[in-house]
Amino acid sequence: MSLLSAIDTSAASVYQPAQLLNWVYLSLQDTHQASAFDAFRPEPPAGAAPPELAFGKGRPEQLGSPLHSSYLNSVFQLQRGEALSSSVYRNASPYGSLNNIADGLSSLTEHFSDLTLTSEARKPSKRPPPNYLCHLCFNKGHYIKDCPQARPKGEGLTPYQGKKRCFGEYKCPKCKRKWMSGNSWANMGQECIKCHINVYPHKQRPLEKPDGLDVSDQSKEHPQHLCEKCKVLGYYCRRVQ
């Protein structure tokens, strides 16, 4: 209030409101810094005069000398520098700032991980067209990758998981070359003759019935295990008696 009352009415009429507020803020800041410097100034011993009075005890010709005034200025600047450095190091410790930065980074990481989890959890599954039929369970309403009867990812490397030999279709992911083979087995690949990498079949079906038997149904017997003459399982007519 004393600072506000000290403002001259003529100055208030000359300065703009923004300039006036800036001047008041700078005055308060200077007062706060001066009080902070006084707080860090060491107290004199009992019975001793203050530094200003102690420096004033001298002959008049010494007090008015430029050497004495420069000495006083250097002492005051030294005290102000010590107070400022101590307040700066006390208020802003490097360890405290590093800890604050680490805490902020950890909180940001947790926040972004929560956002990622929530976005993945809230992502709705795309519905197929009305005429789409799942070729695994033969039901509508979902894609084959979302079928509840599908094998867990990573359980098998090939579509067929039985113990029979079947017909497989291959496509090299590097050179995009396609080929077919009648010597395809479960969880076994073939080497691309051009890139020399192992390629697993993306489609497998029985040998003698390419378009009939569903490879996902493991309960059926494959035709290659039937008799070639009478088509009866467990008997081979061409075997010499």
From Swiss-Prot:
Swiss-Prot/TrEMBL keywords: Metal-binding, Phosphoprotein, Zinc, Zinc-finger
GO molecular function, one term: zinc ion binding
Keyword Hydrolase (UniProt): no
Zinc finger (CCHC-type): 132-149
SMART domains reported for this sequence: zf-3CxxC
One Pfam family, short name: zf-CCHC_2
PTM sites of type Phosphoserine: S65, S93
Intrachain S-S bonds: none
Identification of the protein by name: Zinc finger CCHC domain-containing protein 24
Gene source species: Mus musculus
